[in-house]
């Protein structure tokens, strides 16, 4: 809607304009409205711990996110990570530790991740562990729980088309009351506007 566009233009200008503080430039805010003006929003920030500049070869960082989505409700993610850039700047590697919380159902999980990025290719692996027990959805029959599992993904863009990316992801989720869910996803992402 027009109101939504005006609000987001103002937010973007304040967060990323010439007078914005460095921490604001590492923060992304999104806002949309559903029917009856019900908001969908997200705030995500990535902040270095300690000194970090263009000459730095490694960085410890925190990453926080708060979002409200139509299908999951309000969620928050809090994490810490490390990245090391090699001397010739052509690749980096790192790891992270996160806690995710979904307020609907009061569910929580921990995750540990590793990544290796070289040029146009990237490999990422994440392991997930539920830290909340089963919860009743309706007080009687339907139960819900956080599944343990992992995802492993390799993706690449193209030298002359950085706006296009293809990826392959393997996953396995351990389900409590049925067979484990596992598979392979192959997909593409296209950034059609800059």
Enumerate the predicted regions with their spans.
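Transmembrane beta-barrel domains of bacterial outer-membrane proteins
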Residues: 1-112, 116-141, 158-194
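Outer-membrane beta-barrel signature, preferentially recognizing the C-terminal barrel domain
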Residues: 139-150
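Intrinsically disordered, low-complexity, charge-dense segments enriched in Lys/Arg
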Residues: 151-157
């Amino acid at each position: 809607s027009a109101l939504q566009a005006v609000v987001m233009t103002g937010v973007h200008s304040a967060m990323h304009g010439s007078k914005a503080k460095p921490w604001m430039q590492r923060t992304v805010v999104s806002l949309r409205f559903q029917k009856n003006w019900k908001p969908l929003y997200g705030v995500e920030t990535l902040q270095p711990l300690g000194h970090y500049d263009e000459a730095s070869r490694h960085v410890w960082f925190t990453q926080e996110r708060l979002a409200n989505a139509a299908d999951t409700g309000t969620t928050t993610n809090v994490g810490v990570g490390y990245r090391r850039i090699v001397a010739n700047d052509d690749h980096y590697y790192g790891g992270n530790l996160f806690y995710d919380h979904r307020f609907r159902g009061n569910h929580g999980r921990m995750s540990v991740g590793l990544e290796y990025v070289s040029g146009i290719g990237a490999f990422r692996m994440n392991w997930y562990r539920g830290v909340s027990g089963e919860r009743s959805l309706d007080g009687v029959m339907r139960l819900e729980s956080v599944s343990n599992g992992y995802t492993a993904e390799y993706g690449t863009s193209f030298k002359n088309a950085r706006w296009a990316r293809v990826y392959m992801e393997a996953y396995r989720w351990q389900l409590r009351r049925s067979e484990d869910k596992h598979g392979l996803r192959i997909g593409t992402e296209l950034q059609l506007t800059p």
